[in-house]
């Protein structure tokens, strides 16, 4: 029971006491008791309904692309934390005997600009060195994109008839890949909230209903955002004592399976 409209552009939004309406560029009008905003970090819906946000610039940019590697990725993600930012290679399916990974390389903005200016051969060489040849040489790269990184958090996730979720409500540094997990958890919480409301015959888009979703997710998201900010600063530290204690602590956590598994389940939202 889903109608998928694509491509389509929304011309205007209008919220009323009983429903929210969208007017499309072709003149069609859509109405529903609730509008769910899942339109990304630069959410048009969030801006249209005047959700206030708190945000700041990390001073980092993420270089993203697809690269071909010399060695098989074994369907395993690889990440290296460097003082200038983390480098992650995420496994993709191979094509014949060629091996591919998705790259997310977060760097201080000036260094990211320098890397973006390199030609493909120079960039592959820099990436091979940065990744410590964990998958052999980087053989080739697709077109590169540089995305400025900002932390953003909506002070409220809901107003009457409208709910924000995922990146429209919060964005964090991609150093641990937690943005998508937070978004999935938002979806699960909102689905549960709306399911309970529907079974009880309650208004799906009322502020009373939607506040239950906000009360469940906002503290969880804030806690994860704070943890990731601390994580980022910990790995950016160049102090030898801090680096020694950090590495020793991580080594001990890796050896204590219940603690390690507990952390893994926590960040996966389980």
Give names to the regions the model predicted.
Residues 1:
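Active-site-adjacent segment of FAD-dependent monooxygenases/related oxidoreductases
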Residues 19-23, 28-144:
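Conserved FAD-binding catalytic core of PHBH/FMO-like flavoproteins
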Residues 111-200, 204-205:
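FAD/FMN-dependent oxidoreductases across multiple families
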Residues 5-9, 138-141:
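Conserved beta-strand termini and adjacent loop/short-helix elements that scaffold enzyme active sites
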Residues 192-270:
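C-terminal helical "tail/cap" subdomain of flavin- and related membrane-associated enzymes
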Residues 4-6, 37, 164:
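A structural signal for the hydrophobic beta-strands that form the central parallel beta-sheet
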Residues 6-20:
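A conserved short coil-to-beta-strand element within the FAD-binding core of flavoproteins
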